[in-house]
């Protein structure tokens, strides 16, 4: 429930020669009104007649058939009406995009919303759908439509952990929230401005009953971080797997983007494992017992518990047909990489070792809408999740209980997720290994040398984070909801802001692209690992353009300026309040041109009290304006690509010569972990 509150934010500034800044934009009244109306659609979708009951009359008077001419995609309107006539997924049932029939219905609903010719038609359709389709399907289709419609560009969705808190918080805290909503006010309550506030401690899985045979539970603070899981939810909205690129004017990079983003997430997880004295992510075999168990303590909104997977469990017999399908798809994809081509749906050979080859490969591995032959190469990604998640299915239509791996919001919580993508990324590495290594000419920047790299002291800590739970419980009335605020308080990993100080010498005035990576210095046994054998485990931290002048250049880049990160989401109640006061003209409303990104708090692994060694690698490369491509993403905002591969130069096996070039520099850093009370800083 939205409650009017006020909050302020401090934005830090730092100096850089040329920064790809993320500017804030000033919203006009139309934007503010639309953003406010959209926000309201996400709240209490399971009780649409109770929350904002005035929308009920709007829904009753809207008729899809009478508005047929107000949609560009009339086929979608007609198909949706047929689905509705013959029975769609009922309200109250569990929804997952990884179920074929549910996915089809959600896609048709999205097409209906997306093709509305005007915002008013879109909004009226969304209001109508809020009362008439499955709640979770509605939230998914509405989210994708808001992100991709031109007239809602850069409008924010409420944080999904406040829209669907049952998918981000354990059942223990949700049960306490239910009790409060039902009148149990035994917990501490504070009243301010006639609003009753409840603050509930939220723990991570395993705090009560630790599974000693699941060492990955030590990482729950990372894998269950609500900001990280919200990031992954949004990642899958940038290029929804079901969409065709040309239908929404996507740039032809989604396959490469799929590999790169999952590589980033996997490498970040590995860095966190090292902070906890754990080694590389292990592979998982479908033909042997699965060593990593998963014991979620979460429930779906209708009360069904998430499936669990026992430690050492084997794939059940009824899933064996899918295991064989996975083996077949693996063979076909691996063979295609070796042969250098895939076969499209017309029987034509599509070469892989071309400029678009990696994109083609990523599309067939994911099995997305751009796959050249989904019948031959299938949907390996979804199939492996289905088998390893141990979700429940029955022969009764719509009776499914998806696993954590089968929900975008919960995928990262299961440690097997990272084993899955370690295997999937083997296709990426195999492909890259078959390419020629970078030559000295491709890596060098003549006349430019990095003289030194220093980084501020790196300090991490856990601090409190509060998140609203109201939307996960039933409300008695709109008025009661307005006067109640239930929040979960949780410890989350954070770090002090830090700055890279890079001194670069140039013999001329020239533009350069700076890339910064963070990777392991030692393995879990304390053995030093060299870059040549460990290049694939580095996470890219940042990239930005600089104008180098002739002579010495001091570049300073703050951690919060990274093109990959964003600060924590503004709480829903705070943002809604800003919209309310902006709509009446009392204040100006500003919004970011980069709506989403990786959580800035999680840039650094936890480290250790005495300091955990890692390597920072800095590369300065020539920047040629003629090769620049600007890509506008509805999720990540505008980014500049200089024509090089994502993750360059660590996307390919590293030649030892990389380390002797003057425009490449490796620096050891220590990441120190502190208790919050140890920090001599005002937080």
Swiss-Prot record:
Q: Name one Pfam family in it.
A: Hemocyanin_M
Q: Which GO terms describe its molecular function?
A: nutrient reservoir activity
Further facts:
Hexamerins are evolutionarily related to hemocyanins but do not bind copper and have lost the ability to bind oxygen.
Q: Which family does it belong to?
A: Belongs to the hemocyanin/hexamerin family.
Q: What induces it?
A: In 5th instar larvae induced by juvenile hormone and ecdysterone. Post-transcriptionally repressed by miRNA-34 and miRNA-210 but not miRNA-317.
Instruction: Please name the InterPro entries in this protein's record.
Output: Di-copper_centre_dom_sf, Hemocyanin/hexamerin, Hemocyanin/hexamerin_mid_dom, Hemocyanin_C, Hemocyanin_C_sf, Hemocyanin_N, Hemocyanin_N_sf, Ig_E-set
Keywords attached to this entry:
Cytoplasm, Glycoprotein, Nucleus, Secreted, Signal, Storage protein
Record-given protein name? Hexamerin 70b
Q: Where is the Hemocyanin C-terminal domain?
A: 437-673
**Which residues are noted as glycosylation sites?**
203
Q: Where does it live in the cell? A: Secreted; Nucleus; Cytoplasm; Cytoplasmic granule
> What does UniProt note about where in the body, tissue by tissue, this protein is expressed?
Expressed in the fat body and secreted into the hemolymph (at protein level). Present in trophocytes and oenocytes of the fat body (at protein level).
What is the annotated role of this protein in its UniProt record?
Storage protein that may function as a nutrient supply to compensate for lack of dietary proteins during metamorphosis and egg production.
| Organism this protein belongs to | Apis mellifera
Stretches assigned to coiled coil? none
Q: What are the residue boundaries of the Hemocyanin N-terminal domain, all occurrences included?
A: 32-153
Q: Where is the Hemocyanin middle domain?
A: 159-428
A GO CC annotation given for this chain = endocytic vesicle
């Amino acid at each position: 429930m939205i409650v009017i509150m006020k909050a302020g934010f401090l934005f830090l500034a730092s100096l850089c020669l040329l920064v790809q800044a993320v500017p804030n934009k000033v919203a006009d009244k139309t934007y503010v009104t639309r953003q406010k109306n959209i926000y309201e659609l996400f709240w209490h979708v399971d009780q649409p007649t109770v929350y904002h009951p005035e929308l009920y009359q709007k829904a009753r008077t809207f008729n899809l058939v009478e508005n047929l001419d107000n949609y560009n995609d009339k086929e979608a309107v007609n198909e949706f009406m047929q689905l509705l006539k013959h029975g769609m997924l009922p309200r109250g049932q569990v929804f997952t995009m990884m179920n074929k029939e549910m996915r089809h219905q959600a896609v048709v609903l999205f097409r209906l919303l997306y093709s509305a010719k005007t915002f008013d038609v879109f909004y009226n359709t969304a209001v109508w759908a809020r009362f008439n389709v499955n709640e979770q399907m509605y939230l998914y289709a509405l989210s994708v439509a808001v992100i991709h419609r031109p007239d809602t560009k850069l409008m924010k969705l409420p944080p999904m952990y406040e829209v669907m808190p049952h998918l981000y918080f354990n059942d223990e805290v949700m049960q306490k929230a239910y009790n409060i909503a039902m009148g149990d006010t035994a917990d501490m309550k504070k009243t301010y401005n006639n609003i009753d506030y409840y603050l509930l401690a939220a723990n991570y899985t395993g705090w009560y009953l630790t599974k000693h045979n699941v060492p990955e539970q030590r990482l729950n603070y990372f894998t269950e971080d609500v900001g990280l899981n919200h990031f992954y939810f949004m990642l899958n909205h940038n290029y929804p797997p079901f969409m065709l690129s040309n239908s929404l004017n996507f740039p032809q990079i989604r396959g490469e983007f799929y590999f790169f983003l999952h590589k980033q997430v996997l490498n970040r997880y590995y860095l966190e494992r090292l902070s906890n004295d754990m080694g590389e992510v292990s592979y998982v075999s479908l033909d042997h017992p699965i060593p990593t168990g998963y014991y979620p303590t979460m429930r779906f909104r209708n009360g069904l518990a998430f499936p669990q997977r026992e430690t050492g469990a084997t794939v059940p017999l009824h899933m064996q047909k899918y295991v064989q399908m996975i083996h077949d798809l693996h063979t076909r994809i691996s063979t295609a990489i070796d042969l250098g081509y895939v076969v499209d749906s017309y029987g034509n050979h599509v070469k892989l070792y071309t400029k678009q080859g990696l994109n083609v490969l990523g599309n067939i591995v994911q099995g997305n809408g751009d796959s050249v032959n989904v019948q031959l190469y299938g949907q390996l990604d979804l199939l492996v999740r289905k088998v390893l998640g141990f979700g429940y299915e029955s022969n009764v239509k719509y009776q499914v209980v998806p696993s954590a791996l089968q929900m975008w919001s919960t995928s990262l919580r299961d440690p097997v997720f990272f084993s899955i993508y370690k295997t999937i990324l083997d296709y990426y590495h195999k492909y890259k290994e078959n390419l020629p290594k970078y030559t000295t000419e491709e890596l060098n920047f003549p006349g430019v040398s990095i003289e030194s790299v220093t980084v501020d002291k790196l300090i991490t800590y856990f601090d409190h984070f509060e998140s609203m739970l109201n939307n996960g419980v039933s409300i008695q009335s709109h008025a009661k909801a307005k006067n109640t605020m239930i929040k979960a308080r949780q410890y989350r990993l954070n770090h002090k802001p830090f700055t890279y100080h890079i001194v670069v010498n140039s013999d001329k005035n020239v533009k350069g692209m700076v890339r910064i990576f963070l990777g392991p210095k030692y393995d879990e046994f304390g053995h030093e690992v060299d870059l040549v054998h460990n290049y694939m485990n580095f996470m890219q931290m940042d990239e930005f353009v600089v104008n180098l002048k002739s002579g010495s250049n001091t570049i300073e880049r703050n951690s919060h300026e990274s093109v990959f990160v964003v600060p924590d989401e503004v709480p829903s109640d705070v943002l809604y309040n800003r919209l309310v006061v902006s709509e009446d003209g009392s204040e100006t409303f500003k919004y970011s041109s980069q709506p989403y990104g990786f959580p800035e708090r999680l840039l650094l692994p936890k480290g250790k009290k005495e300091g955990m060694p890692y390597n920072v690698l800095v590369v300065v490369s020539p920047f040629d304006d003629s090769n620049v491509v600007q890509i506008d993403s509805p999720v990540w905002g505008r980014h500049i690509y200089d024509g090089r591969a994502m993750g360059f130069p660590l996307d390919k096996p590293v030649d030892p010569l990389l380390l002797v070039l003057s425009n490449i520099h490796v620096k050891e850093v220590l990441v120190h972990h502190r208790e919050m009370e140890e920090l001599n800083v005002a937080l």
